[in-house]
Amino acid sequence: MDPAAPATRMTSSFTINISTPSFYNPPKKFAPVVPPKPKINPFKAPEEPQSLVPQENSAGPGLHQAFVGKVGEMPPGVDHDDFVLPPPPPSEESISPPSSSFPPPPPSFGDEGLGSPSGGSFPPPPPPEFSEPFPPPIEEFFPSPPPLEECVSDTQDLPVPVPPPPPPPLPSPPAAPPPKPSAPCEAPKPAPVFPKSSPPPAFPKPEPPSVAPKAASSIFIPKPSAPMAVAPKPLAPPPVAAKPSGPVSFAPPSPAPHTFSPDPSAPAHTFSPKTVTFSPKSAPHTFMPKPSAPVTYPQKTTEPPAEASQSSPKVTPAAKHEAPPPTVPSGGRAPGFSFAQQRERPRVLEKPRANLQGSEPEHEPTVEVQVERTRSLGPQTESGRSPGAQSTGGKDMKPLPEGLRSQKPMSDGIHRTGGQHSGHKVTGQQDQTLGSQGLNMKEVEELEMLTQQLMREMDKPPTAEAHSMELCGFCGRGLSRTETVVRAGEHLYHVACFTCSRCDQQLQGQQYYESAGKPLCDECYQDTLECCAVCDKKITERLLKAIGKSYHPSCFTCAVCKCSLQGEPFIVDDNKLPHCVNDYHRRYAPRCCVCGDPIAPEPGRDETVRVVALEKNFHMMCYKCEDCGCPLSIEADDAGCFPLDGHVLCKKCHTVRARAALG
C-alpha cells in the first residue's frame, strides 16, 4: 500500500441487495452508502457480529463485486429500478433522548422466504473471490486529511438517501457516563474514547439501514490523525443527528492543540472559545461549560482555529432537505440540553456592557458575546458570515441580524453592535460629563487664539498702507511689496529716488558714498574731500588736523628735523610751522649767560626752569657767585645774590670787593 495515499482504496466492489425483515410488508431496498475518504470496506470487520452482515438473495455465490465511487452514486451492475426513494425521517418519539445511550441495532432481518426475524440469525455471507487486507488497527495513524473544501464538495453535491424509520428502541445495556453537553458543538476529538464496557472499534461498523446511513450523513466526527474517517460511537449519543428538529452541525478536522476532548472519566472540562461555533439557528441555546471548568478567553488566535471557525457552520447535504428547526429561547429547553446545564451555566459570558442595548431581550447578550468571539476567530465577509457558512447554501442558514453583522471585536472588549445602540449612548454620556466639567482643551485653545487675534487687530488697525513695508528715504511714500526697492544702509528707497544728492545720478548697482546721511556718487564724494596742507592732495584715507589745517598722517612732520609728529608733542613757531620740542628749544629757547646753551626743559619734563638776574638768563646749575663759585639761592637772604658792578656775587665776595674799591 502506498504510504502517501490518504487511505486504503479497494480495487473491486460488492453488489449487495438488502431485503427488509418479514414484518415489513413493502419490500424496500437501499443502495450501499459508501462513507467518505478513506475508502475502506465497511462490510469486513474482525469484531463485527454476523447478525449485522446483510444477506444476498438475488446475487448468487461468487458474484461479489465492489466499486470505488461517491456517496449516492448507483453501482454500474445494479438496476436502478430496484432502489426506492426512502421514507420521511423518523419522528422524535421513536428516538431516545441524547442523554441515554445509543440504542442497540434492530434484530437481524432477512428475506421473507427464509423465515421470521425472530428465528435464528442469518448464515454468514459467502467468502469473497479475493483476499482483502485487513484495515490497520486503531492505534495506527493515517496521513493528514485532504483539504476540507474537497470533502465538503463531495458530500454536498450528491444526494444521500434517508433511511426508513427505526423500530422501537430495545432495552439498552448499562449506560455509559452521559457525554458532556459541550461535546456536540466542540471540534473533533484527538482519539475516540469508548466506555470500558465495550472494546474500541478499529473502524466504523455498518449499522442497520434504519439508523446507520442517517448517522453517517448527518454528523462526521473524524479523528485528527486519520483522514476523514467516519467514527460514530455506538454507545455515545449522536449530537443531534437523529432529531430532524434539532440543529445540524458539522465539526471539521482541526489540529490537536486546538481541539476540545472531553474524557468520560474526567469530572471537569477545559473550555476554550477558540473552537466554539455559532449557528444562527441554535444561538439562544448555546451549550455552556460547567462552573468547575476554567474558562479562558485568549485575545489572539492562530490560523488553525480560524479555519475551524470558518467551516463550522457547514451542514451536510441531507440537512438541506429538512425544514429549519424552530429557534428555542434561552428560557426553554433545547434538544440535547439538560436542566442541569441551565443551572450550571456560568455568567461570565453575559457581559454587562452588552446590556446597553435597551431594546434587546434578556438572552441577547449571550448571543452577542458568542458571535463576537466566533467572528474574532475567522475572517469576516461582507454579509457578516464566515466563508464556511456561505458555501453550504442559504436554505438552512438564517441571515444574521443587522446588529450582529456590524459587530467587530474591540481590543478593550467593548461591543459596537449596530449604528444606533451602545456607541451613541456612551457618546452622549461623555458629552454630558464634559459639559458638567466645563470647557475642554480644544475650546480653550480656540478661545485663546481668537482673543490674541482680536488684540492684534486692535493694536494695528487696518489701513490703506498696511501692505507696504516701510517708507522711502527720499520721497517718504510707501514701498509696495511687489515693486523693486533699494536698500542703502538702514533705509529703503525707490529706484528712481536713489540718486546722488548733488548730481542726481542713478546709484542703483554702483558704488556710492554717504555724506551727512545722503548718498553721493564717486566724483561728488571726491569733491567734498579736503586737501593736505603739505602736499596739496585729496585726503581719501585718514585725516589729521593741526593748527587749523588738514594733513595726511605722513605729511605732518617737524619743520627742522622732518620727524613725524603723529602722536608726538610739537611746538609751532611764529611762522605756523610745527617743530618738535628739541628743535624748537634749540632754535627759539633763551640761552644761558654762563654756558651759552639754550635753556630747555629737563628730560622727562615739559617745563623749562631758568633763573633771570641782572637781566641775564641762567640755568639753575649755572647760577653761582663769580668770585668764589658758590651756588646762590634764588631767595632774598644771606645766601642769595649780592650783585656789584654787574657781577653776581655772594655776600662775602661783595664785601671784599666793596672794601677794595674804597681802599
Swiss-Prot record:
Tissue and organ expression note: At the early gastrula stage, expressed at a low level in the animal hemisphere. Expression rises by the end of gastrulation in the anterior part of the embryo, where it gradually increases by the midneurula stage. During neurulation, expression continues most intensively in the anterior part of the neural plate and around it. At later stages, intensely expressed in the brain and at lower levels in the spinal cord, eyes, nasal placodes, within somites, and around the cement gland.
Predominant place of localization: cytoplasm
An individual GO BP term: transforming growth factor beta receptor signaling pathway
Keyword Hydrolase: no
Compositionally biased residues, Polar residues: 298-314, 377-393, 427-438
Cross-referenced CDD domains: LIM1_Zyxin, LIM3_Zyxin
GO molecular function list: DNA-binding transcription factor binding; metal ion binding; transcription coregulator activity
UniProt cross-references to Gene3D superfamilies, sorted A to Z: Cysteine Rich Protein
Domain named LIM zinc-binding: residues: 470-531, 532-589, 590-660
Keywords on record: Cell adhesion, Cell junction, Cytoplasm, Cytoskeleton, LIM domain, Metal-binding, Repeat, Transcription, Transcription regulation, Zinc
Compositional bias ranges of the Pro residues kind: 122-148, 160-211
Annotated InterPro entries: Znf_LIM
Region (Disordered): 35-438
Keyword rRNA processing: no
Family in the record: Belongs to the zyxin/ajuba family.
Biological function: Adhesion plaque protein. May be a component of a signal transduction pathway that mediates adhesion-stimulated changes in gene expression. Suppresses the transcription-repressing activity of hesx1/anf1.
Protein name (Swiss-Prot/TrEMBL): Zyxin
Taxonomy of the source species: Eukaryota, Metazoa, Chordata, Craniata, Vertebrata
